Swiss-Prot record:
UniProt xrefs under Pfam families: ATP-synt_B (PF00430)
The protein, known as: ATP synthase subunit b 2
Main location class: membrane
Protein source organism: Vibrio campbellii (strain ATCC BAA-1116)
Keywords on record: ATP synthesis, Cell inner membrane, Cell membrane, CF(0), Hydrogen ion transport, Ion transport, Membrane, Transmembrane, Transmembrane helix, Transport
Any one annotated GO CC term: plasma membrane
Lineage: Bacteria, Pseudomonadati, Pseudomonadota, Gammaproteobacteria, Vibrionales
């Protein structure tokens, strides 16, 4: 029965082959598989970490964007407020200038009125004296007549 001896030899060869594989081939394969498993786990961990960082960056970006928008709105509001203040100041200044010009105009009108009144009084006095002189056909004392006419005009 060569078949048994051959089978026995094959079994011993198989056991030796398995032992050699376990001793020299299997440990490097297990090591490679463990390293690959560790790399995959590390890659998954890094992917999760990157996803978390991305979410955090999005949240920070949204917060920064919201803050920037609020600051921009505050600057716009401040600009509008300053504009309103400047317009109010310009209106006040224009009103003051208008009041000054009106006051100067009134003063000038009053001055002109007084001047014209005085000129009219003087001219009226001259005309009255001249008329009176022609009526009585003689030349009266002009200073006495002028005083008399001025007193008469002032009583009016």
């Amino acid at each position: 029965m060569n078949l048994n001896a051959s089978m026995f030899g094959q079994a011993i060869s198989f056991v030796i082959f398995v032992w050699l594989c376990m001793k020299y081939v299997w440990p490097p394969l297990v090591k490679l598989l463990d390293e690959r498993r560790a790399e995959i786990a590390q890659g998954l961990e890094q992917t999760e970490k990157a996803a978390q960082e991305l979410e955090l960056a999005k949240a920070n970006g949204e917060a920064l964007l919201t803050e920037a928008r609020s600051k921009a709105q505050a600057i716009i509001n401040q600009g509008k407020q300053r504009q309103e203040q400047m317009v109010a100041e310009a209106v006040d200044l224009a009103n003051q200038e208008k009041a000054r010009i009106v006051a100067e105009g009134k003063a000038e009108v009053e001055s002109e009125r007084s001047k014209v009144r005085q000129e009219l009084k003087d001219e009226m006095a001259d005309l009255v004296i001249e008329s009176a002189s022609k009526l009585i056909n003689r030349n009266l004392d002009s200073s006495a007549n002028r005083d008399l006419v001025n007193r008469f005009i002032n009583e009016m």
